[in-house]
From Swiss-Prot:
The keyword S-adenosyl-L-methionine does not apply. It comes from the Bacteria. InterPro entries: Ribosomal_uL6-like, Ribosomal_uL6-like_a/b-dom_sf, Ribosomal_uL6_a/b-dom, Ribosomal_uL6_bac-type, Ribosomal_uL6_CS. GO terms for molecular function: rRNA binding; structural constituent of ribosome. This is Large ribosomal subunit protein uL6. Keywords: Ribonucleoprotein, Ribosomal protein, RNA-binding, rRNA-binding.
């Protein structure tokens, strides 16, 4: 059996899980997430534990088993604790600010770049060079953070741009003059 797939998922207090066929709804203090899983996977809720079982040991069932369990665990953690991804701006004059819900980036273009977060996601700007993306859905938090980073990814010579917090940017050697 898949080592990831056979681990049961504990449901923390304040989180409710509803299974309707192959659609699972998880409600918690940070929000509500719904996802439809592959019909071959059997998801059962007993007390405060979720278990995922598979019909056979075929390769695609083994793969689906671990994936389904991980996605469910991420949903449960997302509605109870939430996810956040931090980004930092490196570069002279690179600034981030908030106008209402919109994130406004001035990162060396002739115009400020505005990014509107989707429903269920939140952007915080604790300082002009730091951005924090928060939300219950791990995938959507990561996707929004990646979209913000894509506005001005770190360049390889000086390292200027938007990077994830703690991301190491390998710098290249410049051309040596004669």
């Amino acid at each position: 059996m898949s080592r990831v797939g056979k681990k049961p998922i504990e449901i923390p207090a304040g989180v409710t899980v509803t299974v309707n066929g192959n659609t699972v709804t998880v409600k918690g203090p940070k929000g509500e997430l719904t996802r439809t899983f592959h019909p071959d996977m059997t998801i059962t809720v007993e007390g405060n534990v979720i278990t995922v079982t598979r019909p056979s040991d075929e390769k695609h069932h083994r793969a689906l088993h671990g994936t389904t369990r991980s996605l469910l665990a991420n949903m449960v953690e997302g509605v109870s604790k939430g996810y956040e991804k931090a980004l930092e701006l490196v570069g002279v004059g690179y600034r981030a600010s908030k106008q209402g819900k919109k994130l406004v980036l001035s990162v060396g273009y002739s115009h400020p770049v505005e990014i509107e977060p989707e429903e269920g996601l939140e952007i915080e700007v604790p300082s002009q060079t730091k951005i924090i993306v928060k939300g219950a859905d791990k995938q959507r938090v990561g996707e929004l953070a990646a979209n913000i980073r894509a506005v001005r990814p770190p360049e390889p010579y000086k390292g200027k741009g938007i990077r994830y917090e703690g991301e190491l940017v390998r710098l290249k050697e410049g051309k040596t003059g004669k």
